[in-house]
């Protein structure tokens, strides 16, 4: 895994600029640096050596040096693809060169052939264009900025700060979306003028005209298998075994994150890495160390654990937000930060369980309870009555469940509804939440309720939050994360499952749990979801954490954007609860 940068500009100091951009992402690749400067184009790369340690430095050129690549990621089917590229001469054993020659053969159809995680830039001098692609689910990040004369792109926004004309302007219109989703769900970022290339998309830059064209090459599709439950369970097991084996391809040691849940326990039971890593906290219900140790003892592998204190957590916040580039309200970001720090002492590569919930139905919200099973016209009528009653937890729930799905469900982690944001924000020109997800709901209008929810969460929650966190936090410590659940062959199985194979009678990931049950030697296959639990709710009630948050609310920028009295009221209510 690595980090890439690029600048297309008339600026005469591009060689220094690209060097400075690379320095901003040194943590993504401390092993080697690659730079290319010619004409209006400057490309950079920082390398973390994982495959072909000696021969994989970049840029890598084709045979006549008319095409070159800067690449971040791992393509796990590169050996199979290489067999289809026998007409080309290979100078290395790296997957990077396979991607380069794959472009020569398949052109812009290349990303459709790739199985893995990637964000690469291929400069085709013959066409005068740079072809950039991001993997199907957004495992690897890619951002870009275009001010008319200059185009910047890179793995992290912070590299753009090296460009003197880049202005750091807060994109206030995203505040409403952030408060609702707890992350930035849009292609726009909190830096005005900076965008993320969406997952499953490619971007073509016309170097001379400074034009950008974005195309989608992958769409999430759902079906409905007619296979029996036992057949599906067997199919999941086969796909996961194959994916795990491919994700273990490496010239360096591979470890694994491990919690007490089914996803990471399944991965560890399949991969059996020499070392696994777990963090916990002093409060027993927030520590998964004992569960992890039980599993690794049964598998006869090593578990390395660490307990994180409240003070360590607080002290890490600024470092975490620096590496995230944008704000996140997801406490697991800090948990993954400490996990990555722990693992980085031993290994360069770790397996992690992201993607299982979004593919196989891992959230309770996906299942209907007694109330949501009522006909919509009844729920809508009940909501109308509750609107004139005093507001409390019950009436708010009934009102929300009286909305159509397109308005009631925008994210698995929804915090605010549009009509509640006016109490929090002083600005009123924020993007409405239902407008953010409208395109997805329009595109999937003919699918069932669960598939619509999965499509929303794969597009936003998985790509822009979960996978972004695991990439940024592992890269902060110069290690590579690999996510075997978020794999095209695994998804091809998951996308065909009917609802009752995913969620049923309060049980999530029904079929996946049954596949995991066959290889996990303890009862982790049936444990309820915890994620990476962090005791933030308890800590906020303690004076030091409470005062830190209250002081933040009282800053000038906070007073400019938020209704501080309302925020402090919520904070005090939580502290005194």
Which ranges hold each PLM region?
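N-terminal glutamine amidotransferase
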Residues: 1-74, 101-221, 241-245, 268, ...
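Structural motif
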Residues: 88-94, 109, 168-172, 231, ...
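PAPS-dependent sulfotransferase catalytic core
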Residues: 520-575
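Glycine-centered helix-coil hinge/cap
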Residues: 86, 104-108, 521
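General small-molecule cofactor/ligand-binding pocket signal
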Residues: 91, 215, 304-306
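A short, charged helix-loop
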Residues: 431-443
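ATP-dependent adenylate-handling active sites, centered on carboxylate activation for C-N bond formation
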Residues: 8-16, 87, 126-151, 207, ...
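Globin-like tetrapyrrole-binding proteins
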Residues: 462
């Amino acid at each position: 895994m690595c980090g890439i940068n690029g600048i297309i500009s008339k600026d005469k100091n591009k060689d220094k600029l690209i060097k400075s951009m690379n320095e901003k992402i040194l943590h993504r690749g401390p092993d080697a640096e690659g730079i290319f400067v010619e004409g209006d184009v400057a490309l950079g790369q920082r390398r973390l050596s994982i495959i072909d340690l000696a021969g994989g430095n970049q840029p890598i050129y084709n045979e006549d040096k008319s095409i070159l690549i800067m690449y971040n990621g791992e393509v796990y089917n590169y050996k199979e693809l290489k067999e289809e590229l026998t007409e080309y001469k290979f100078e290395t054993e790296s997957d990077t060169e396979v991607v380069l020659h794959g472009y020569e053969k398949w052109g812009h159809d290349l990303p459709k052939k790739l199985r893995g995680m990637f964000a690469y830039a291929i400069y085709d001098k013959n066409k005068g264009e740079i072809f950039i692609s991001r993997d199907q689910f957004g495992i690897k990040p890619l951002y870009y900025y275009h001010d008319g004369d200059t185009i910047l792109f890179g793995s992290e926004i912070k590299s753009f700060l090296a460009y003197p004309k880049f202005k750091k302007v807060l994109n206030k219109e995203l505040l409403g979306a952030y408060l609702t989703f707890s992350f930035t769900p849009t292609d726009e970022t909190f830096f005005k003028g900076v965008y993320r290339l969406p997952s499953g998309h490619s971007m073509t830059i016309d170097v001379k005209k400074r034009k950008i064209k974005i195309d989608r090459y992958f769409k999430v599709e759902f079906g409905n298998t007619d296979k029996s439950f036992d057949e599906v369970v067997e199919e999941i097991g086969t796909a996961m075994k194959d994916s795990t084996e491919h994700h273990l391809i490496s010239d360096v040691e591979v470890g694994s994150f491990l919690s007490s849940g089914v996803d990471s326990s399944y991965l560890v039971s399949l991969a059996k890495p020499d070392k696994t890593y777990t963090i916990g906290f002093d409060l027993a219900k927030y520590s998964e160390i004992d569960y992890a140790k039980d599993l690794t003892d049964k598998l006869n592998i090593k578990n390395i654990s660490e307990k994180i204190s409240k003070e360590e957590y607080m002290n890490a916040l600024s470092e975490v937000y620096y590496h995230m580039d944008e704000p996140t309200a997801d406490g697991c970001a800090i948990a993954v930060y400490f996990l990555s720090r722990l693992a980085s002492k031993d290994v360069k590569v770790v397996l992690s369980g992201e993607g299982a919930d979004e593919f196989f139905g891992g959230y309770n919200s996906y299942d209907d309870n007694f109330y949501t099973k009522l006909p919509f016209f009844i729920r809508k009528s009940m909501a109308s009555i509750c609107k004139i009653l005093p507001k409390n937890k019950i009436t708010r729930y009934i009102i929300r469940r009286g909305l159509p799905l397109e308005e009631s469900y925008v994210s698995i982690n929804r915090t605010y509804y549009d009509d509640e944001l006016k109490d929090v924000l002083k600005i009123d020109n924020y993007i409405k939440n239902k407008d953010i997800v409208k395109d997805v709901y329009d595109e999937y209008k003919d699918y069932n309720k669960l598939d619509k929810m999965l499509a929303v969460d794969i597009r936003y929650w998985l790509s822009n939050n979960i996978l972004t966190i695991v990439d940024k936090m592992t890269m902060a410590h110069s290690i590579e994360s690999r996510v075997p659940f978020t794999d095209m062959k695994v998804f091809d199985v998951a996308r065909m499952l009917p609802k009752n194979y995913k969620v049923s009678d309060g049980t999530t990931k029904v079929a996946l749990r049954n596949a995991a049950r066959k290889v996990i030697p303890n009862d982790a296959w049936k444990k309820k979801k915890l994620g990476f639990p962090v005791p933030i709710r308890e800590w906020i009630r303690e004076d030091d954490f409470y005062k830190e948050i209250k002081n933040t609310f009282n800053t000038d920028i906070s007073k400019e954007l938020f209704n501080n009295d309302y925020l402090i009221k919520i904070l005090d209510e939580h502290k005194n609860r």
